[in-house]
């Protein structure tokens, strides 16, 4: 059997934490680097498609004790006040990353995963070993996973092509108290972006929107942009005017890229948003992060049973399975995003989809996977 069974994971989001849990259970000694200490908030829509629910339940995480919402209805609104509603056959649940990530962290820590709350500054692959450099020293491992999310200084070090193409998108997230149906996720369109709102735990709602950064450049700050751009959608204006905003300032992230990304760089295996990000309106980025971690972890565990590690075979299998499972869904998400954020196109799309419910359901299926 391949020895030593050690692996380092950079990034403690859903993909990193899921990988850590499965690999530790699979006999690896796992070290995970994360810049922040749990629990903390992230920019995220916090809606998880039920395609991930059986897997999470198989870990015996006791998710129900956190009080997630159950969501089975979708609403899409336009600046002119039109609304499209539809059932979500598979459905999903709402739960904050503050709660979910912390639950996974505590579970992983009990399994014996080593957590180092440090920023990784460099990764080098030399003589069949990864050297991971942080502020506190150099760590070595025969295997390493990059699960550090949407964008990192490490992307520049690996000269990943998407890093050099400036992305026009920014993300903003609030937690609010408001009066909306508990089983609804609503997408509100505005010029240059769209917003999603859904219930999470403890009577709170997640309000998260994606906007072109050009919107912000026209105004003096986020609140002024919201007043002049987002509020042109009457549904959004009512939401902002009739909700209690929690936690003070919003969480903000810039340079969100939906371009295709490489899965492997110099034998470093990318997972979750680091490997490719589906557009938020598809509503299953969290499920994809978890699923991709499951796929990669199972492949690593299986290949580790060999007497010697065949990196090329491992990487080929991961590339093939990831591509078959996610490539079309991410491509469909990029296409569908073109229907949103442009007021005229959005009005037409909502009108057409409202009259063709079968097409509406087909689009949902194109961006969602099967239960895993």
Model-derived features: where do they sit?
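FAD/FMN-dependent oxidoreductases across multiple families
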Residues: 122, 138, 217, 221-299, ...
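A conserved beta-strand/loop capping segment in the N-terminal third of enzymes
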Residues: 52-103
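N-terminal Rossmann-fold NAD(P) dinucleotide-binding loop
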Residues: 16-17
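Beta1/beta-strand and adjacent pyrophosphate-binding region of the FAD-binding site
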Residues: 2-13
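Glycine-rich FAD pyrophosphate-binding loop
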Residues: 10, 24-44
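C-terminal helical "tail/cap" subdomain of flavin- and related membrane-associated enzymes
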Residues: 298-372
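Predominantly flavin-linked oxidoreductase catalytic cores and closely associated redox partners
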Residues: 107-236
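Conserved N-terminal glycine-rich FAD pyrophosphate-binding loop of Rossmann-like flavoproteins
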Residues: 37-57
């Amino acid at each position: 059997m391949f020895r030593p069974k050690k692996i380092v994971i950079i990034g403690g989001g859903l993909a990193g934490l899921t990988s850590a849990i499965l690999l530790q259970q699979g006999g690896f000694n796992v070290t995970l680097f994360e810049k922040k200490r749990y629990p903390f908030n992230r920019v995220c829509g916090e809606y998880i498609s039920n395609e991930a629910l059986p897997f999470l339940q198989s870990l015996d995480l006791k998710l129900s004790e956190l009080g997630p919402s159950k969501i089975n209805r979708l609403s899409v609104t336009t600046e002119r006040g039109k609304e499209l509603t539809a059932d979500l056959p598979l459905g999903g649940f709402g739960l904050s990353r503050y709660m979910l990530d912390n639950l996974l962290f505590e579970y992983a820590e009990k399994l014996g995963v080593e957590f180092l709350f440090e920023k990784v500054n460099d990764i080098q692959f030399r003589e069949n070993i990864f050297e991971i450099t942080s502020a506190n020293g150099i760590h070595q491992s025969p295997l390493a996973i990059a699960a550090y999310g949407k964008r990192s200084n490490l992307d520049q070090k690996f000269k990943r092509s998407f890093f050099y193409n400036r992305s026009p998108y920014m993300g903003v997230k609030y937690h609010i108290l408001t009066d909306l149906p508990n089983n609804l996720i609503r997408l509100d369109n505005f010029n240059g972006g769209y917003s999603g709102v859904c219930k999470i735990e403890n009577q709170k709602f997640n309000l998260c929107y994606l906007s072109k950064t050009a919107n912000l450049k026209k105004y003096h700050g986020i609140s002024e942009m919201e007043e002049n751009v987002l509020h042109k959608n009457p549904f959004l204006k009512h939401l902002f005017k009739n909700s209690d905003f929690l936690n003070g300032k919003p969480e903000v992230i810039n340079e969100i890229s939906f371009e295709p990304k490489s899965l492997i760089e110099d034998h470093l295996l990318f997972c979750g948003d680091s490997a490719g990000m589906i557009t938020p309106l598809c509503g299953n980025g969290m499920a994809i992060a978890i699923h991709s971690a499951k796929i990669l972890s199972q492949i690593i565990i299986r290949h580790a049973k060999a007497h010697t590690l065949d990196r090329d075979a491992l990487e080929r299998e991961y590339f093939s399975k990831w591509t078959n499972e996610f490539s079309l869904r991410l491509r469909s998400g990029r296409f569908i995003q073109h229907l949103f954020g442009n007021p005229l196109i959005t009005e037409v799309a909502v009108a057409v989809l409202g009259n063709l419910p079968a097409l509406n359901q087909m689009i949902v299926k194109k961006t969602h996977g099967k239960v895993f």
